[in-house]
Amino acid sequence: MHLDGTTSFITGAAHGIGLGIARSLARQGSRLALADLDRPALGAAAAELAELTQVEAFELDVRDRDAYARVADEAEARLGPVSVLCNNAGIAFSEVLDDTTYRLWDLVLGINLGGVVNGVQTFLPRMLDRGAPAHIVNTASAAGLIGAGVGCMYTTSKFAVVGLSESLRHQLGTAGHPVGVTVLCPGGVSTNLARTARSLVGAEPGVGARVERTAPQIEAMLQRHGADPGAVGDQVVDAIRNDRLYVLTDRAGIDLVTRRTDAILAAMPADGRTDAGLDDLRRAAREVP
């Protein structure tokens, strides 16, 4: 997909990976609609990127479907039809089992999964109506491929984003639509994601104090060992241009991915249906009235 002259809509665009993606898209000649909750950082990002391309900035909570639709309308009125959607907004914080309250489940799933769903539901129908080449990038995590080492709320949300992306790409491809889907599964990236969680979980008993205590340590570790957001942005742009499904930023989890895959393969019966049988089932499911 060619990016020069397109319009890109990016959530979580004021910091980290989102800003890295925005910079990379701007260098390719794409106009930018930047969405984020952090108004000061959003303004700074817009001012920086306006040196490269046409930019509009929107304060947006991705959980708010009505607001999402209004912002989408305004962005397209100012910048033209959105053909690249980057569902990047997310929340992460240090989890322990005592944190698994309904309130926090709703918060994590609402942002990390609901924000992606709301982006897809808002923009995909517009993309399909136009019938022109388009692309959707959903930010998941390496934790969406490995069910170990990270809290269950975050991991659940990211596994869901991977599954959504794989299924959506398959459905769009089967139907012949010119809309690609990429799922970004970053490992450690040099961002302030831990710090941005403070405003959302700071008042939660136990969690807020722990986030305040651990955020500086997590950020220092990511600064030392994490991937550069600009390099991640370049990977995403390359995936859009070449219609790649997966983007991974490092090989740190390769042993865990291998063990998980091996365990799944070992759990399969020695005999029974193979891919041909699954193809029959998929075909039958599509033909159900």
Where would I find each of the regions flagged by the language model?
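Conserved glycine-rich Rossmann-like NAD(P)H-binding loop of the short-chain dehydrogenase/reductase
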Residues: 28-45
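SDR active-site lid
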Residues: 171-248
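Residue(s) in the substrate-gating loop at a strand-loop-helix junction
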Residues: 141
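The beta1-alpha1 cofactor-binding region of Rossmann-like NAD(H)/NADP(H)-dependent oxidoreductases
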Residues: 39-40, 58-70, 102
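Canonical Rossmann dinucleotide-binding motif of NAD(H)/NADP(H)-dependent dehydrogenases/reductases
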Residues: 2-33
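Substrate-binding pocket helix/loop in short-chain dehydrogenase/reductase
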Residues: 96-97, 101-106
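Active-site helix of classical SDR
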Residues: 120, 157
